[in-house]
Amino acid sequence: MLHDDTNNLDRVEVMITAAGRITVLTGAGISTASGIPDFRGPNGLWTKDPDAQRAATLSHYLGDEEVRRRAWQNRVRWIDRDPQPNDGHRALLRLQERGQLRGIVTQNVDGLHQRAGIEPRIVHEVHGNIHRSRCWDCDDMRPMRETLQRVIDGDPDPRCALCGGILKSDTILFEQSLVPEVIDAAFRASEDCDVL
C-alpha cells in the first residue's frame, strides 16, 4: 500500500511540475493546521455545540434575536485570536510565485489564503469571508472588527448604521443562495487550468 501511495505522490508531483495553469480546491482541512476548527469533525464547532448550527441557518438567524445575540458573542470570543497561514497556504503561495497558480476555489471563510500573500483576485471564496459584516437589507459592508467593537461596547445585536437592518457576517448560511458572480468565477478558474 505504501508503494502505491508513493507512486501516486510521484505522479502528482510530475503533474504539478509540468502544469502551466493550476487551480486548487480547498476546504476546512487546510486551515485546521492554523488552529481554526472545522464544523463537523471530532472537535468541530457543531460537534461540540449542536445549537450553534441554528446561528448558521438563515431563517433562525434572521428570525430570532437571541440566535443573533449568541452568534455575535461567539464571534467576539474569536476577536483576539490571530490564526496564521500554515505550510499548506505557503505551498500555494509558492505555486503563485512560480506563475502556475491560476485560482483557488475555497469553502473557507477565514481569509488565510490572502493573508499568506496570494492575490485576492484569484481566491474565490464560495462561502464568503468572516472578516466583513453585511447588512441583510441594504448590503452595506463593514470590517467585522468594527461591528464586533459595537458588540464589545454593549450592543448585543448590532444593526446597520445606514438603514437599521440586520447585520450578519458576510458568509453564506444554510438556506442562503451562493453568490452567482463568485460561483461563475470559480467555474472559470476550474475550466481554465491544466491541473485541478
Model-derived features with residue positions:
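Conserved catalytic core of sirtuin-type NAD+-dependent deacylases
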Residues: 1-196
